A protein has these predicted regions:
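PLP-dependent amino-acid enzyme catalytic core
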Residues: 1-267
Length: 267
């Protein structure tokens, strides 16, 4: 499943490969025209694009249901190539180490990474890199109007939205209201207790919220270096204009979300 960006990357990587068929689920009418053209113009026999009536979360729920059916998955040799696959997260850890080496002169320096986030995959890789010992002072999580993750890091309440409550924005790859990989971070936050995570996600699977603000776990949050913020359409426009005027760099809307929140949290 894709919200717009990784779908074409996966399809182009797999096109023409023998013994592999790709079924790519995407939210109908919710991606940019360029993203749709990248994916839907492929005519390879082993690439099948499926437009789902709903948001990205609906497409991702289908993929998760297939992945959770072990017998069906094994029988048809099905694998997932988006961010619910641990291999995807593991590969992204490398970005943070490389970024750190490019930005610093010595191992004594600390850095902050700002990550525009819908799903929690990319910044989860940053969290793991930090846990591995990479000197990351802050992980700056930026959302668009679909601010379920920002709400959690500000309040302790994780409240996934349904399709009707999910906004269609000008940074469409972040139009996600039920973040994958977030349970991987919560696992660390609650002391790596699988029973606690299981209980919390039983609520999520029923469409309910959970609140950690009054628990002992919430006191641990500062130890993980996360801060968060939200960006709106007008913020994106202003940030794109700022970057063009100051640096002569044209940003895409998702990067603009990340830069806007980063600028608010400069240290």
């Amino acid at each position: 499943a894709t919200s717009g960006d990784t779908g074409s990357a996966a399809e182009y990587a797999m096109r023409g490969k023998r013994g592999v068929r790709v079924f790519m689920l995407s939210p109908e009418g919710k991606m940019s025209a360029f993203q749709r053209a990248q994916m839907y113009s492929l005519q390879d026999d082993n690439i099948v694009n499926i437009a789902v009536r709903g948001m990205f979360d609906d497409a991702q729920d289908i993929v998760k249901a297939v992945s959770n059916d072990a017998a069906f998955k094994a029988g048809y040799k099905i694998g997932a190539v988006n961010s619910i696959n641990w291999a995807r997260v593991a590969a992204q850890i490398v970005y943070y180490f490389q970024g750190y080496f490019l930005a610093t002169q010595s191992n004594d320096e600390k850095v902050a990474f700002a990550v525009p986030s819908g799903n929690f995959g990319n910044i989860c890789a940053g969290h793991i890199a930090r846990q591995m010992g990479l000197p990351i002072a802050q992980l700056v999580l930026a959302t668009n109007e679909n601010d379920v993750l920002d709400e959690f890091f500000r309040t302790g309440v994780y409240r996934p939205r349904n399709t009707a409550e999910t906004s269609i924005t000008s940074s469409p790859s972040m139009d996600i209201s039920k973040a994958s990989n977030f349970e991987r971070f919560i696992f660390d936050l609650v002391g790596r207790d699988p029973a606690v995570v299981s209980d919390l996600w039983a609520k999520v699977d029923k469409g309910e919220a959970f609140d950690l603000s009054a628990t002992v776990y919430w006191k641990n949050l500062p130890n993980f270096g996360f801060i968060s913020g939200k960006s709106t359409h007008i913020d994106r426009i202003n940030t794109i204009r700022f970057a063009q005027g100051r640096y002569n760099v044209m940003l895409d809307t998702h990067t603009a979300d990340g830069l806007k929140v980063a600028l608010e949290n400069l240290v």
